[in-house]
């Protein structure tokens, strides 16, 4: 899988933190997020899912994710935003790949991406959250175009 190394600014994000199987929590989180964004007239810069755990090592019921929108750095939570978190995705060097997800199989491109990164001779993955940015509305289009971000650092030879 093709990817490039990019220097990312930190992102300020607002949304929901969920724990449980991702195929359930991510969908539920975005439903909550859409209702909150619509009710508060927030104009998101990006729609993002943040993944904290490795599903090969963490039981499904303990998997953590955030479903969030990117907001300006000066953003404050509006009143009546119970359960909404305001947090940051750290900046730094990230490997970034683009994929098209068909049939809601989000795991497949991630595994392909990780396999490619494991073979990279110049960079290694960091134990930081990974995240994906949605480039379209898959609910309308029938597929999702996503950007996948994995924190990396140069390998020391």
From Swiss-Prot:
InterPro entries: AraC_E-bd, DNA_gyrase_inhibitor, DNA_gyrase_inhibitor_GyrI, GyrI-like, Reg_factor_effector_dom_sf
Gene Ontology molecular functions: DNA topoisomerase type II (double strand cut, ATP-hydrolyzing) inhibitor activity
Name of the protein this chain belongs to: DNA gyrase inhibitor
Native species: Escherichia coli (strain K12)
Annotated segments matching region Required for interaction with DNA gyrase and inhibition of its activity: 89-96
Protein's cellular compartments: Cytoplasm
Coiled coil: none
Bilayer-crossing regions: none
Complex formation: Interacts with DNA gyrase. Interacts preferentially with the holoenzyme composed of GyrA and GyrB, but can also weakly interact with the individual GyrA and GyrB subunits.
One Pfam short name: GyrI-like
Free-text function comment from the UniProt entry: Inhibits the supercoiling activity of DNA gyrase. Acts by inhibiting DNA gyrase at an early step, prior to (or at the step of) binding of DNA by the gyrase. It protects cells against toxins that target DNA gyrase, by inhibiting activity of these toxins and reducing the formation of lethal double-strand breaks in the cell. Protects cells against the natural plasmid-encoded toxins microcin B17 (MccB17) and CcdB, and synthetic quinolones. Can also protect cells against alkylating agents that act independently of DNA gyrase, suggesting a more general role in protecting cells against DNA damage.
Source organism, top-level taxon: Bacteria
Keywords: Cytoplasm, Stress response
Gene3D superfamilies in alphabetical order: Regulatory factor, effector binding domain
GO biological process: DNA damage response; negative regulation of DNA-templated DNA replication
Induction, per UniProt: By DNA-damaging agents and by the entry of cells into the stationary growth phase.
Membership in a protein family: Belongs to the DNA gyrase inhibitor family.
One GO CC annotation: cytoplasm
SMART domains assigned to the protein according to its UniProt record, in alphabetical order: AraC_E_bind (SM00871)
